[in-house]
């Protein structure tokens, strides 16, 4: 899947500034602003007293994106995409860039790398309004990165790249296609599998075992930028089904890795010390609406459980007191290794949700952890 775009209607018209003195120029606005000398602002404590490294932290804080929780923009708490830190659209306040040329010189490039790039690889009904479609957003990102390259800028590293994915779309290669966009260099990638995004999880039979195929990992590993030092996988389910996610998490930490053979490899902590567990409660209205024969949820709230497994360098894991699985290291040392899927039940569930079972590799069933076991 190629997200690069090319005009089919001839050359595009240039964008010109409406500001006096900046009109009728094909030179990008930031280049024109930076080409002129700026006042040193020595009368301002921001420049005369505060060290540059401290000033950079202040600017980073001011230009980081945030939830715009003004009343008209808040998402309905009863929809599937409402969740902590995603209650409203995110925005960046850029007023700081318009204060003076000296500040602009130090900050003009910050809004893009500081903004968390969020992409939704799932059903359109489970995506916040205004988020756009997957292909369209990917093309926009490709255009922005292409413009940065054309301007001769050095590699721009994005702080955070967050993907919400349905496991079926994930297994079809949409994430690897997204990461293949030229010029994309995220420092941290977060992949969130919501409780509604599991392939083989049926609203009529929510206790059906979960299944997480692994064929997508090799393609993603080929596309990960050398700038990526963390790859987080967030596995979400309902609180009373958390044992299933814990079992899948144990399998992932012991067997999976990200990275190219001969290059930097990102592992997970098999001891569980570096894993994170979070919980939140949300409306049961959306859940009840899609449940017919299964017993209805009691009350107005449902409790959700999220297990976060972070893949990072072996050195980073050891510094945190964690342990890298010897199995994962052996797997990473084998250039022909194929990742083993995580299966909590009969693979025949795929006959309903995906390719025929004869197309799937043999997948071992995973035992559920005992109640006394710590992940």
Give the label of every model feature segment.
Residues 2-11, 15-26, 160, 165-375:
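Eukaryotic C-terminal
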Residues 1-160, 296, 304-375:
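Short, surface-exposed structural microsegments at secondary-structure boundaries
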């Amino acid at each position: 899947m190629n997200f690069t775009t090319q005009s089919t209607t001839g050359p595009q018209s240039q964008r010109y500034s409406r500001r006096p003195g900046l009109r009728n120029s094909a030179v990008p606005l930031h280049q024109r602003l930076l080409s002129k000398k700026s006042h040193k602002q020595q009368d301002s404590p921001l420049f005369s007293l505060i060290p540059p490294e401290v000033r950079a932290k202040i600017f980073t804080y001011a230009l980081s994106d945030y939830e715009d929780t003004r009343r008209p923009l808040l998402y309905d708490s009863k929809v599937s995409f409402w969740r902590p830190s995603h209650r409203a659209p995110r925005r960046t306040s850029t007023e700081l860039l318009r204060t003076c040329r000296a500040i602009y010189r130090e900050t003009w490039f910050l809004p893009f790398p500081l903004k968390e790039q969020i992409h939704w690889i799932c059903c359109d009904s489970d995506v916040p309004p205004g988020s756009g479609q997957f292909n369209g957003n990917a093309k926009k990102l490709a255009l922005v990165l292409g413009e940065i390259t054309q301007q001769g800028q050095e590699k721009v590293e994005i702080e955070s790249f967050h993907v919400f994915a349905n496991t079926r779309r994930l297994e079809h290669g949409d994430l690897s296609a997204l990461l293949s966009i030229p010029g994309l260099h995220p420092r941290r990638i977060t992949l969130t599998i919501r409780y509604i995004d599991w392939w083989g999880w049926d609203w009529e039979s929510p206790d059906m075992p979960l299944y997480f195929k692994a064929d997508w990992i090799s393609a993603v590993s080929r596309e990960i930028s050398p700038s990526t030092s963390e790859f987080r996988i967030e596995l979400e389910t309902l609180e009373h089904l958390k044992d299933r996610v814990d079992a899948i998490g144990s399998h992932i930490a012991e067997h999976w890795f990200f990275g190219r053979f001969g290059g930097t490899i990102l592992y997970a902590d098999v001891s569980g010390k570096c894993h994170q567990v979070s919980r939140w409660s949300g409306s049961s209205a959306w859940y009840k609406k899609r449940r017919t024969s299964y017993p209805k949820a009691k009350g107005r709230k449902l409790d959700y459980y999220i297990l976060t497994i972070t893949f990072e360098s072996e050195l980073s894991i050891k510094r945190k007191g964690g342990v890298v699985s010897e199995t994962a290291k052996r797997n990473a040392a084998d250039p022909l290794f194929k990742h083993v899927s995580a299966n909590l039940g009969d693979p025949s569930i795929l006959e309903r949700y995906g390719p025929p079972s004869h197309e799937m590799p043999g997948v071992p069933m995973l035992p559920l952890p005992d109640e006394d076991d710590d992940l």
